[in-house]
Amino acid sequence: MRIHLIAIGGSAMHNIALALKQKGFKITGSDDAIFSPSKDRLAKHNLLPVKMGWFPSKITSDIDAIILGMHATVDNPELKKAQSLDIPVYS
C-alpha cells in the first residue's frame, strides 16, 4: 500500500510516517518547511522530501491513501489533485 503524507514534517505526522514505513507501507510525503528533530528523523529513514513545497505531480493514481496534516490548508494543490483522483483522504 502506498501512502502520501501532506505536511509530513509535523511532530505527529513524521511519527506516523515512520510507524507506517516500519509496518511495510510505501511512504512519500511533502511539506513547505521541516525542522529538526523531525527533519533529522525523516532523513535517517529516507523519508525527507528532496525539495520543500507542494507538488501536485507527486500525487498519482497509484497512491492508495493521503494523510493530511494540520498544517495543510483546504486549497493545498496536492490535496486538490488527490480529490480529483478520488484518492481517500484521512486527517
Which residue ranges define each predicted feature?
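N-terminal leader/targeting and accessory segments in enzymes
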Residues: 1-91
